[in-house]
UniProtKB/Swiss-Prot annotation:
Keywords: ATP-binding, Ligase, Magnesium, Metal-binding, NAD, Nucleotide-binding. GO terms for biological process: NAD biosynthetic process. ATP binds at residues 47-54, 161, 190, 212. Its EC number is 6.3.1.5. Homodimer. This is NH(3)-dependent NAD(+) synthetase. GO terms for molecular function: ATP binding; glutaminase activity; metal ion binding; NAD+ synthase (glutamine-hydrolyzing) activity; NAD+ synthase activity. Pathway: Cofactor biosynthesis; NAD(+) biosynthesis; NAD(+) from deamido-NAD(+) (ammonia route): step 1/1. Mg(2+) binds at residues 53, 166. InterPro entries: NAD/GMP_synthase, NAD_synthase, NH(3)-dep_NAD(+)_synth, Rossmann-like_a/b/a_fold.
């Protein structure tokens, strides 16, 4: 392990192995503790894509809210799952299967197409032609705006799905899906998230599907690994302190350097200023 690898692992808090049940408990307790300390909060809001990460955070959140209601007798504690399609989503069935699995207290659907297209048109009227890639980032940021709109009307906080395998590469939109109040699975890599979903009894197809941000229309359902040029297994091995090929290590470290500006992290399980 080189010095940079050790530094990255320490910063992202990744462990070489985990006990899935203990990490489930840890994330749930983190979310509950934040609610107990901030008694004006009554809901958590999370965008649901139908992929592994939002399915995991959603399942953990519903567990936390069920326990909060049982422990306090306050039925106003609610988990609000939000579908945020741009028009029609190709894998809508996966998103609905994820919501059914996590048994969210409330489900809202906000079609972001009108807002995104209006912004693109407004920019065009000023002479700015938005690229397909940039439009994808606008989609992510509109989704963030919608979630905060819902949270603001429901005494809520917005949850993010950032984890260490995503954070190391900066594979998220700054002030888009990177915009959140709490990130309950920060410290985990991709395979550890899979292990936690297996422990929770999630349908396999929700965490074995090919990961994709699916933001670009010119390249629909572009696999994360193709966009990054490195596999999640290689990223996970790197984060667990294992040896990876020189080519993979270079790509991972280049992504880490290039996206350093994105890692001004929201509140994690390791922050103590709010306690």
């Amino acid at each position: 392990m080189n010095a940079l690898q050790a530094e990255i692992i320490a910063a992202l808090k990744t462990q070489p192995t985990i006990d899935p049940a203990k990490e489930i408990r840890r994330s749930v307790d983190f979310m509950k503790a934040y609610l107990k300390k901030n008694t004006f909060l009554k809901s958590y809001v999370l965008g649901i894509s139908g992929g592994q990460d939002s399915t995991l955070v959603g399942a953990l959140t519903e567990k936390a809210m069920q326990e909060m209601r049982a422990e306090t007798g306050d039925e106003s504690y609610q988990f609000i799952a939000v579908r945020l399609p741009y028009g029609e989503q190709a894998d809508e069935s996966d998103a609905m299967a994820a919501i059914e699995f996590m048994a969210a207290d409330q489900v809202k659907r906000v079609n972001i197409k009108g807002s995104v297209d209006a912004m693109v048109q407004s920019l065009a009227e000023t002479g700015v032609t938005v690229s397909d890639f940039n439009k994808g980032n606008i989609k992510a940021r509109v989704r963030m705006i919608a979630q905060y709109g819902i949270a603001g009307e429901n005494s809520g906080a917005v949850l993010g799905t950032d984890h260490s395998a995503e954070s190391i590469t900066g594979f998220y939109t700054k002030f888009g899906d990177g915009g959140a109040d709490l990130v309950p699975i920060f410290r985990l890599n991709k395979r550890q998230g899979k292990a936690m979903l297996a422990e929770l009894g999630a349908p396999k197809h929700l965490y074995e599907k090919v990961p994709t941000a699916d933001l670009e229309e010119d390249r629909p359902a572009l696999p994360d690994e193709l966009a990054l040029g490195v596999t999640y297994d290689q990223i996970d091995d790197y984060l667990e302190g294992r040896q990876v090929s020189e080519e993979a290590a270079t790509k991972i470290e280049n992504w880490h350097k290039k996206t350093a500006h994105k890692r001004h992290l929201p509140i994690t399980i390791y922050d103590t200023f709010w306690q």
